[in-house]
Design a protein with these regions (language model features):
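Bilobed "Venus flytrap"/periplasmic-binding protein-like clamshell domains
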Residues: 1-58, 152-156, 172-181
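Structural recognition of the beta-strand scaffold that forms the well-ordered cores
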Residues: 16, 63-67, 87
Length: 182
């Protein structure tokens, strides 16, 4: 593929998540950071990860984007059938995206996460939040967070990134008030 950075996406057929999905919003920001919109792409297919993998396998999409944990089943599926290239988002590309959303941060997809990926790849990451209505009973919120904290080792077996969660990181200021039960 001749896609080596976000700057190379103009004129390429895309497979992205449904409108309003986090991955789709990040894709729109990635394009916007390069002065592009979906109108600069010949085809944009909004669908599931499974749809995106099928489009890539069939040659009907030249790139797909997703916001998920590593390793991702969809990427593993594609990599089992086709050679893949994970396009880095770093340096000026990351900085432009952070202008659009300061919550984006640099993360690394470790070498060997996917078949044929022999080097670390820098990309963007973001935090996931649990949002509760203010009127939710404080005991319910407390017990939910207590259980989440207690089962971090079990949860990290499903989503490795959860393994870094601690009461301190869970309670980090994200710019909105924490619930009374938190």
């Amino acid at each position: 593929s001749d896609i080596n950075s976000p700057a190379d996406l103009k004129g390429k057929a895309a497979a992205v998540q449904p409108k309003g999905n986090t991955g789709e919003a990040i894709t729109a920001h990635m394009l916007q950071s390069q002065g592009l919109t979906y109108d600069d792409l010949p085809r944009v297919n909004h669908g599931s990860y499974t749809d995106a993998v099928s489009l890539m396998k069939d040659g009907n999409a030249e790139f797909f984007t997703l916001g998920t944990t590593v390793p991702a089943g969809a990427v593993m599926d594609l990599a089992s059938a086709r050679d893949i290239k994970i396009v880095p988002i770093e340096g000026e590309h990351l900085a432009k995206m952070q202008e659009l959303n300061p919550g984006y941060k640099q993360i690394v997809i470790p070498a060997g996460s996917y078949p044929g990926q022999d080097a670390d790849v820098n990309t963007i990451g973001y935090a996931t939040h649990i949002i509760a209505r203010c009127s939710l009973d404080a005991d319910v919120v407390y017990n939910l967070l207590k259980a989440l904290n207690e089962y971090v080792p079990d949860l990290s077996a499903i989503a490795k990134a959860v393994g870094n969660a601690t009461p301190e990181t869970m309670g980090r200021d994200i710019g909105v008030p924490l619930h009374d039960g938190a």
